[in-house]
Curated annotation (Swiss-Prot):
Keywords per UniProt: Activator, ATP-binding, Cytoplasm, Kinase, Nucleotide-binding, Nucleus, Phosphoprotein, Serine/threonine-protein kinase, Transcription, Transcription regulation, Transferase
Keyword Thylakoid recorded: no
Record PTM: Dually phosphorylated on Thr-171 and Tyr-173, which activates the enzyme.
Family: Belongs to the protein kinase superfamily. Ser/Thr protein kinase family. MAP kinase subfamily. HOG1 sub-subfamily.
Residues noted as binding ATP in the record, renumbered to the chain: 26-34, 49
Protein EC: 2.7.11.24
Protein name as annotated: Mitogen-activated protein kinase HOG1
Description of activity control: Activated by tyrosine and threonine phosphorylation.
Written domain comment of the UniProt record: The TXY motif contains the threonine and tyrosine residues whose phosphorylation activates the MAP kinases.
Top-level lineage group: Eukaryota
Residue numbers bearing the Phosphothreonine modification: 171
Positions of short motif TXY: 171-173
Length: 358
């Protein structure tokens, strides 16, 4: 059994193994607190994310299990990687990942980005998306604060807690409004990997302009702002709307013409706008894919088809429709953690695996 130390950070108890020292708070999310720390075993800086009460409800247990499975499966230079995971004596779960110095949200609020940085950041976002999409995974909550950057401008996508299987009948969810694809608001249940490309397009526009492109106050205002730039949705999109209330709302909006992107983004590179227009398309069926976007001339300085890998195998989503009690999720989680550490059930684990109360 590993030794643990208990700390209070922002009024939250952090229980970590003695391997990690010098903890400092770096961020607080809806589902956990993140601290930086020094890993004495590897002499590197790491980020430690505490999952708050992972076994409090079946929904939260499943969400935590999903994120753990994804982090174990996804191995790519532009996706955050898991270096350690452990369960504390209080049965909280801690994910340990590499530490990057900042995120895109902080960069965008501090200063305008130069052209070469915009290109390089967009290239890396799309390179990461190509990989996860090839594994049958949709991130679903891509936004600047979920895109980490280090001092070398290396970029990694993080926070896969909302990620889901690529499925044409996806269930509705709550993501960050500014970056939400219109098909989520219009059809709610029918969307796929194209939603991430829309989000990446919104982030691309924000890098070009230095401010959010579609800062809606609520979902109605959000959709209205989108139509101010893209015009009224085409008939092919309106036909996909299942909800009568949504259909009435869309039909009640004034008819709007598309605004030329060169008029909206007066100082932008024409090649950048050509790619942006292909990413911000109302109809997800005609929206450019991440793989196609990588080959666009705007990204030619970085594009290398021999170094833009796809996943070797699709992610196993067989657990995703399971409606299981907390104790079952707990056992499954312990099994995944043991597997991560390459320890079988008869071995001696370095971290605690508390008994499950049946």
């Amino acid at each position: 059994m590993a030794d643990f130390v208990k700390l209070s950070i922002f009024g939250t108890v952090f229980e970590v193994t003695t391997r990690y020292v010098d903890l400092q708070p770096v961020g607080m999310g809806a589902f956990g607190l993140v601290c930086s720390a020094n890993d004495q075993l590897t002499s590197t800086s790491v980020a430690i994310k505490k999952i708050m009460k992972p076994f409090s409800t079946p929904v939260l247990s499943k969400r935590t299990y999903r994120e753990l499975k994804l982090l174990k499966h996804i191995r790519h230079e532009n996706i955050i990687s898991l270096s350690d995971i452990f369960i504390s004596p209080l049965e909280d779960i801690y994910f340990v990942t590499e530490l990057l110095g900042t995120d895109l949200h902080r960069l965008l609020t501090s200063r305008p980005l130069e052209k070469q940085f915009i290109q390089y950041f967009l290239y890396q976002i799309l390179r990461g998306l190509k990989y996860v999409h090839s594994a049958g995974v949709v991130h679903r909550d891509l936004k600047p604060s979920n895109i980490l950057v280090n001092e070398n401008c290396d970029l990694k996508i993080c926070d896969f807690g909302l990620a889901r299987i690529q499925d044409p009948q996806m269930t509705g969810y709550v993501s960050t409004r500014y970056y939400r694809a219109p098909e989520i608001m219009l059809t709610w249940q029918k969307y796929d990997v194209a939603v991430d490309v829309w989000s990446a397009g919104c982030i691309f526009a924000e890098m070009l302009e230095g401010k959010p492109l579609f800062p809606g106050k609520d979902h109605v205002n959000q959709f209205s702002i989108i139509t101010e730039l893209l015009g009224t949705p085409p008939d092919e999109v309106i036909k996909t709307i299942c909800s009568e209330n949504t259909l009435r709302f869309v039909q009640s909006l004034p008819k709007r013409e598309r605004v030329p992107f060169s008029q909206k983004f007066k100082n932008a590179d024409p090649m950048a706008l050509d790619l942006l227009e292909k990413m911000l398309v109302f109809d997800p069926r005609t929206r450019i894919s991440a793989a196609e976007a990588l080959a666009h001339p705007y990204l030619a300085p970085y594009h290398d088809p021999t170094d833009e890998p796809e996943a070797e195998e699709a992610f196993d989503w067989s657990f995703n429709d399971a409606d299981l009690p907390v104790d079952t999720w707990k056992v499954m989680m312990y099994s995944e953690i043991l597997d991560f550490h390459n320890i079988d059930n008869s071995g001696q684990d370095e971290g605690p695996v508390p008994p499950v109360n049946n």
